[in-house]
Amino acid sequence: MCIRDRYSSSLETVEKILKENSGYDIVLDLHRDAIGDNTYAPTVKIGEEYAAQLMFVIGSNGGVDEHENWQENLKFAVKVQEKANELYPGLFKPIILRNSDYNQFVSKAACIIEVGATGNTLEQCLASMKYLSKVIREL
Protein backbone atom coordinates (compact mmCIF):
# COMPACT_ATOMS: atom_id res chain seq x y z
CA MET A 1 0.00 0.00 0.00
CA CYS A 2 1.48 3.37 -1.00
CA ILE A 3 1.65 6.30 1.42
CA ARG A 4 -1.24 8.15 -0.27
CA ASP A 5 -3.48 5.06 0.16
CA ARG A 6 -2.48 4.71 3.82
CA TYR A 7 -3.42 8.33 4.49
CA SER A 8 -6.73 7.92 2.64
CA SER A 9 -7.52 4.90 4.78
CA SER A 10 -6.48 6.58 8.02
CA LEU A 11 -8.52 9.68 7.13
CA GLU A 12 -11.70 7.60 7.18
CA THR A 13 -10.81 6.35 10.66
CA VAL A 14 -9.91 9.79 12.03
CA GLU A 15 -13.05 11.41 10.62
CA LYS A 16 -15.20 8.64 12.11
CA ILE A 17 -13.59 9.05 15.55
CA LEU A 18 -13.94 12.84 15.44
CA LYS A 19 -17.60 12.55 14.40
CA GLU A 20 -18.38 10.08 17.20
CA ASN A 21 -16.43 12.08 19.80
CA SER A 22 -17.08 15.74 19.17
CA GLY A 23 -15.07 16.79 22.24
CA TYR A 24 -11.74 15.85 20.69
CA ASP A 25 -9.68 18.61 19.16
CA ILE A 26 -6.14 17.18 19.29
CA VAL A 27 -5.19 14.58 16.66
CA LEU A 28 -1.79 12.92 17.12
CA ASP A 29 -0.45 10.62 14.41
CA LEU A 30 2.33 8.66 16.12
CA HIS A 31 5.19 7.20 14.08
CA ARG A 32 8.68 5.90 14.60
CA ASP A 33 11.30 7.81 12.67
CA ALA A 34 12.70 5.43 10.05
CA ILE A 35 15.98 7.35 9.76
CA GLY A 36 19.23 5.44 10.03
CA ASP A 37 19.67 1.84 11.03
CA ASN A 38 18.75 -0.05 14.18
CA THR A 39 21.63 1.54 16.08
CA TYR A 40 20.21 5.09 15.88
CA ALA A 41 18.18 5.65 19.04
CA PRO A 42 17.81 9.30 20.08
CA THR A 43 17.12 9.53 23.81
CA VAL A 44 16.94 12.04 26.61
CA LYS A 45 17.49 11.24 30.28
CA ILE A 46 14.60 12.39 32.44
CA GLY A 47 15.11 11.62 36.09
CA GLU A 48 16.47 8.10 36.21
CA GLU A 49 15.05 6.84 32.91
CA TYR A 50 15.79 7.29 29.24
CA ALA A 51 12.96 8.40 26.97
CA ALA A 52 12.92 8.34 23.18
CA GLN A 53 13.21 11.83 21.77
CA LEU A 54 10.14 13.16 19.99
CA MET A 55 9.82 15.27 16.86
CA PHE A 56 6.84 17.09 15.38
CA VAL A 57 6.28 16.82 11.63
CA ILE A 58 3.91 19.50 10.37
CA GLY A 59 2.48 19.56 6.86
CA SER A 60 2.28 22.94 5.16
CA ASN A 61 0.77 24.60 2.11
CA GLY A 62 4.06 24.22 0.24
CA GLY A 63 3.08 21.15 -1.74
CA VAL A 64 0.27 19.88 -3.92
CA ASP A 65 -1.94 19.23 -0.90
CA GLU A 66 -3.15 22.49 0.60
CA HIS A 67 -4.92 22.89 3.89
CA GLU A 68 -5.94 25.94 5.83
CA ASN A 69 -5.01 24.64 9.29
CA TRP A 70 -1.28 24.19 8.83
CA GLN A 71 -0.33 27.41 10.65
CA GLU A 72 -2.63 26.54 13.55
CA ASN A 73 -1.08 23.06 13.67
CA LEU A 74 2.37 24.66 13.78
CA LYS A 75 1.28 26.99 16.61
CA PHE A 76 0.00 23.97 18.55
CA ALA A 77 3.30 22.13 18.03
CA VAL A 78 5.29 25.17 19.18
CA LYS A 79 3.09 25.51 22.27
CA VAL A 80 3.57 21.84 23.18
CA GLN A 81 7.29 22.00 22.50
CA GLU A 82 7.73 25.14 24.62
CA LYS A 83 5.94 23.51 27.57
CA ALA A 84 7.97 20.32 27.07
CA ASN A 85 11.22 22.31 27.07
CA GLU A 86 10.12 23.90 30.33
CA LEU A 87 9.21 20.58 32.00
CA TYR A 88 11.51 18.07 30.26
CA PRO A 89 14.36 19.79 28.39
CA GLY A 90 15.55 17.78 25.40
CA LEU A 91 12.40 15.67 25.02
CA PHE A 92 11.75 17.19 21.58
CA LYS A 93 14.00 17.59 18.57
CA PRO A 94 13.35 20.62 16.31
CA ILE A 95 10.02 20.78 14.45
CA ILE A 96 10.11 19.66 10.81
CA LEU A 97 7.90 21.28 8.14
CA ARG A 98 6.96 19.19 5.09
CA ASN A 99 5.18 19.92 1.80
CA SER A 100 2.22 17.61 2.38
CA ASP A 101 -0.94 17.70 4.46
CA TYR A 102 -0.75 14.26 6.17
CA ASN A 103 -4.50 14.62 6.91
CA GLN A 104 -3.63 17.43 9.30
CA PHE A 105 -6.45 19.53 7.85
CA VAL A 106 -8.87 17.60 10.13
CA SER A 107 -8.07 19.81 13.13
CA LYS A 108 -6.29 22.96 14.23
CA ALA A 109 -4.23 20.74 16.54
CA ALA A 110 -3.29 17.83 14.27
CA CYS A 111 0.27 16.67 13.77
CA ILE A 112 2.63 13.78 13.34
CA ILE A 113 4.91 13.01 16.25
CA GLU A 114 7.90 10.83 15.47
CA VAL A 115 8.56 8.74 18.59
CA GLY A 116 12.23 7.89 18.64
CA ALA A 117 13.68 5.85 15.81
CA THR A 118 14.04 2.20 14.85
CA GLY A 119 16.82 1.72 17.42
CA ASN A 120 14.78 2.88 20.40
CA THR A 121 13.31 0.30 22.75
CA LEU A 122 9.61 -0.01 23.46
CA GLU A 123 10.30 1.09 27.05
CA GLN A 124 11.97 4.29 25.84
CA CYS A 125 9.02 5.05 23.54
CA LEU A 126 6.48 4.40 26.30
CA ALA A 127 8.44 6.65 28.66
CA SER A 128 8.29 9.49 26.15
CA MET A 129 4.51 9.02 25.83
CA LYS A 130 4.19 9.34 29.60
CA TYR A 131 6.03 12.67 29.50
CA LEU A 132 4.13 13.87 26.42
CA SER A 133 0.79 13.21 28.15
CA LYS A 134 1.95 15.22 31.17
CA VAL A 135 2.97 18.10 28.90
CA ILE A 136 -0.39 18.13 27.11
CA ARG A 137 -2.26 18.06 30.43
CA GLU A 138 -0.33 21.20 31.44
CA LEU A 139 -1.50 23.20 28.41
Name what the model sees in each region.
Residues 69-96:
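Active-site-adjacent substrate-binding region
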Residues 24-31, 91-99:
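Surface-exposed patches in mature extracellular/periplasmic domains of secreted proteins
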Residues 1-3:
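Short, small-residue-biased leader/transition segments that mark boundaries at the very start
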Residues 14, 37-44, 95-101:
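Alpha-helical scaffolding within the catalytic cores
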Residues 20-61:
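Active-site microenvironments of hydrolase-like enzyme catalytic domains
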